[in-house]
């Protein structure tokens, strides 16, 4: 499964570890990419769970994208990932302002977010 993490701070790291645990239990092989805003080195135990670290998106399409960067960056991350992921996990709160629920896409929120672009 091709997975992208946007933001790999403490929250992203927690989700990364949990995903690896669940995938291992189910025999799912992961190919994890971390989209980073900083070139600083990750802790070795975290880096070992990541196959690729990138500073900008390319044309790769992912099965799943985790958006775990700061809330103020969620909307732009979603816009940048339009057409690049089949499913999204977005750390709450999804947006800092409901204005983001307007425009060229519609989001329905509950326990799951479904975005129609």
Question: Over which residues does each language-model region extend?
Answer:
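A contiguous active-site-proximal alpha/beta segment in oxidoreductase catalytic domains
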Residues: 95-117
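Short amphipathic alpha-helix with an adjacent loop that forms part of the alpha/beta core around
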Residues: 52-61, 103
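N-terminal Rossmann-like dinucleotide-binding module
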Residues: 1-49, 58-60
């Amino acid at each position: 499964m091709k997975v992208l993490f946007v933001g790999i701070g403490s929250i992203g790291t927690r989700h990364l570890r949990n995903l690896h645990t669940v995938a291992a239990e189910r025999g799912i092989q992961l190919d994890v990419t971390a989209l980073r805003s900083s070139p600083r080195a990750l802790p070795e135990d975290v880096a070992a769970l990541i196959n690729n670290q990138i500073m900008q998106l390319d044309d790769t399409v992912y099965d799943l994208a985790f958006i775990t960067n700061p809330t103020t960056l969620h909307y732009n991350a979603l816009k940048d990932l339009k057409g690049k992921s089949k499913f999204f996990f977005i750390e709450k709160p999804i947006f800092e302002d409901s204005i983001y629920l307007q425009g060229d896409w519609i989001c329905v929120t509950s326990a799951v977010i479904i975005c129609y672009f």
